[in-house]
Amino acid sequence: MRIGLFAVGRLKAGPEKDLAVRYLDRFAKTGPAVGLELARVAEMVESRAANAETRKREEAVQLEKALVDGSLLVLLDERGKALDSEAFANLLATFRDSGKRDLMIAIGGADGLDPALHARADAVLCLGKMTWPHQLVRILIAEQLYRAVTILSGHPYHRA
């Protein structure tokens, strides 16, 4: 299964980007052994519309353009379902085994994600009940993707 990340906002050069890239590289190297591969990271500039609803809608249009036809969609949202690392790994395995070829994980902008995306999503997850800066969400999901692969492959990185 090809997994892509979609993010509203660009990750500027610096330690946050370096760490996210490090975990995505690890995922890209180890994922194929368990049938998961990194397809791409798609970034878009945040909408500059006057109100939040319009910004969310404009950002949703960009996300829809980035989606491959028939792909699964997972949204990261502070009101989503919290999973531990093993449950996240199992969710990825379930998606992989579903016969779908593509999965997109979406990180919304400062205003969140459009309700139409929530209605279309295959899962809405949170990385805890706290609100996280965009840069840290990228690092956290990159690390969790790598951790999921190590869980699925039996690698000792994850020691629960």
Swiss-Prot record:
Its main location: cytoplasm. GO terms for molecular function: rRNA (pseudouridine-N3-)-methyltransferase activity. The keyword Transferase applies. It comes from the Bacteria. SUPFAM superfamilies: alpha/beta knot (SSF75217). CDD domains: RlmH-like (cd18081). Its EC number is 2.1.1.177. GO terms for cellular component: cytoplasm. It is found in: Cytoplasm. Gene3D superfamilies: 3.40.1280.10. S-adenosyl-L-methionine binds at L76, G108, L127, G128, K129, M130, T131, W132. Keywords: Cytoplasm, Methyltransferase, rRNA processing, S-adenosyl-L-methionine, Transferase. Specifically methylates the pseudouridine at position 1915 (m3Psi1915) in 23S rRNA. Homodimer. Belongs to the RNA methyltransferase RlmH family. PANTHER family: METHYLTRANSFERASE, RIBOSOMAL RNA LARGE SUBUNIT METHYLTRANSFERASE H. This is Ribosomal RNA large subunit methyltransferase H. It comes from Sinorhizobium medicae (strain WSM419).
